[in-house]
Amino acid sequence: MKTLCIILGSLCTFYFIGIAVYAGLSSLFPCIWAAGGVFFYGIAVFLHLNRKHGMLSGFAFPAVLKHGLLVLAVLCVLVFVAVEALIFTGMFHKPSKDLDYIIVLGAQVNGTKLSNSLRLRVERAGEYLEENPEACAVLSGGKGTGEDITEAEAMYRYLVKKGVSPDRLLKEEHSTNTSENLKFSLKIIDTEEDGKGKEASIGVVTNNFHVYRGVALGKKLGCSHIEGIPSKSNTFLQVNYLVREFFGVVKDKAAGNMSVSYTHLTLPTTPYV
């Protein structure tokens, strides 16, 4: 047990260091890996001291408490695995052709430059627009900390520079999170479709780990023809993204923003990563 804790603590610690060196700490979430390292190392030290000095000799946990903690731990693991399985369904989705609209979800902009995650989303959107010339795109994202322009404007400039006609691009520049991305973008589509936006076929373009939540949010808002268009994501950071997305799904479910279902699913041979 002590050896296992040392291994897990080392994995968490080195992954945290890797993230800090490779991508920087633009958010606090990667610190969860540092906390995990401290947690597992702490257990290892405690087990070592207990074995050497008998710190818990003569003490026994009440059976009810022991069994209760075990049941709680198992339930937590089962919930985590179940949510991650749902997230994976979005990662493997193969989008339909000739959708009426695609919604490109915003992500961090550094000044006026797209972050790596956002660039991958916009590149995927550009591919879909090129393959489906009748589709229009709603570029969704407001202006956050460290951003000189809105995320929507940054995406717009990138796609126009790549040759996409401005007539096919609509900007949503007020959202600050994924839920608002979908809500505000659907209002724009509703206006374009004279109040019948929910009848349009819509694709949600985002990094593969984020597709499930984006589509589920759209379904909760009443869209019956909505599906995911997964883009690539950074391979090294994928584990961090998947764990972070677990909390995002749980948060939006608890807030009533989404239902836990995903009915539009196609499984190709390999995921779009």
Positions of predicted regions on the chain:
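Membrane-embedded alpha-helical segments of integral membrane proteins
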Residues: M1-K52, L242
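Lipid-exposed faces of alpha-helical membrane segments in multi-pass integral membrane proteins
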Residues: I7-F14, L72-L78, A82, V243, ...
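Structural signature of transmembrane alpha-helix termini at the membrane-water interface
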Residues: F14-G24, L78-T89, G126, V250, ...
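Transmembrane alpha-helices and immediately adjacent membrane-cytoplasm interface residues
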Residues: H48-L49, A60-G90
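A structural signal for short, hydrophobic/glycine-enriched beta-strand patches
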Residues: L75, A82-L242
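A transmembrane-helix-recognition feature enriched in membrane-embedded lipid enzymes
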Residues: L242-V260
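Conserved small/polar residues in nucleotide/adenosyl-binding loops
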Residues: T263-T269
